[in-house]
Amino acid sequence: YEAAYIYKLANKDAPAISGESLLKKAKKAPYAGGQLIDHIFPGIADSVRKKVEYVIRDGIDNGQTNQEIIRRIKGTRQQNYADGLLNQTRSSIDAEVRTARAHISSTTYLDTWIALGYKYTKDVATLDGRTSKGCAMKDGRIQKIGEGHQKPPYHRRCRTTQIGCNSDGAVEGLRPFVADKRAVKDIPKDQRVGKIGQVDANTTYKDWFAQQDESFQREWLGPSKYKLYKEGGYPLDKFVDPLSGQPFTLKQLKAVDEKTFKELGL
């Protein structure tokens, strides 16, 4: 459905898309640090894993939402979850389904952009307080499609996507933001003013973050890193290892810049 929508926007006929073929292709391509999709289900017996894969594949074929697929695997509260495939926590199953689906969707999107003639992709992270530091720094990154090209998911529960673009990465339109760590549904309606809105589609996470208030910045970075950001002149990308995409610890940062830490009393 997602790929067909992109073709529709481009005024082109979409080819038939099979969940079976997509899953096979996605399973051959590593995700998030070299893992294969089979490794998304740690500790699950082989027979059960195959059933989970079937439910995901069938759910995608039938246009089911993440929640509908999760319900089929986890079961329903009315049945005391006895009608689900697995007896695991909701968060664990949720992470597995979302990561697997993101990997399959990412593979489909990339094929779609290539079919539409794009030679570059642009990473688009989510502008909110739940986005990982690594994805925030990847936001707006432009890559040429081909050898060495990276695609999401970059970690479990990764929400970053990619869009086709030209070499300059410029796109039209707006992108949404939520200046809060809570999902929109968890923010009371009387607290949403100023927290939810839209910005130009070419605004990066770093640019957007710089425009947020102190409380949001401090909560996302933590008090010590916030001080380094505001008073020490640290750009956001200095807090993240460019190779692994993982945040540096304060101990690691201090080891290479003890002078700034001393000046700020950290």
Regions found by a protein language model. Give the residues of each.
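Acidic, glycine-rich two-metal-ion catalytic cores of nucleic acid-processing enzymes
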Residues: 82-179
